[in-house]
Amino acid sequence: MTTDFCPGYPAPYDGLVADYPDVSVYPADGFRVEWGPIFHRGRLDGSASVLVLGQDPAVLETVARRILVGTAGQRTQGLLTKLGLTRSYTMVNTYLYSVWGQGAADRHVNDPLIAAYRERWLTALIAHNDIRAVLTLGTLAATAFTAWRATADGAAFTGQHAALIHPTYPESASASGQITKAEATKRLLENWNAAIPAVSAAIPSPDQPPTGVPYGDDFTAADLTPIPAGDLPAGLPAWMRGARSWGVRTGADPDTKRATITVTVPPDARPWM
């Protein structure tokens, strides 16, 4: 059996992953630095036409060592499928590390050293790919991208920018009581539907024809796309690419929960049963 996999980090990205900011830049009271940095997902071979800028890695990303593989990743992958993209994309996050605690994400988005490293990635990706569109997921990503656009390198970018509502906005907004989950999902999908025509027009040669099927008022199974094996490190099992959540932080107190991730193989992926 032949299985595709992410080949790793060629130049110039090898220099970026070798020289990443540590706890002296990302404070431990705001980020889960103990789990290490998580850099990207997608193509680093110069073939990307779309750049996705996310927020920060969550539980599943921490295990898989690539960004946007959980719920947000499945929804984002589905959006790329609607755009006709199966390979020609690349993704980075606003933050290298998972955010810890209330307010840390907003407090640190403009920290000079955090921003400087993030902007090195954005500059390298856009310099070494024919990026026609940038999709920012949520307000933090839009803020980070706008800040990069104000730099000399960013000012030279002439592609499309689609500022999208974050893929897990329905869960976060409804949990805080701002809005019902159904209403929040409808708002999200209206935002995504509105962005699709301009982004599609900016991509002259998608990997396959765009689906032409807009979102409805809620996500359906057809709107979610499994993470491609070629986006993940060699050897990760196929069930880590699917829509089911297989990892969760566990513990009786905040410190234990921060230090512990429990991974469970889904029942239908247990060959001994």
Go through the PLM ranges and name each one.
Residues 1-273:
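A polyanion-binding, active-site-adjacent surface
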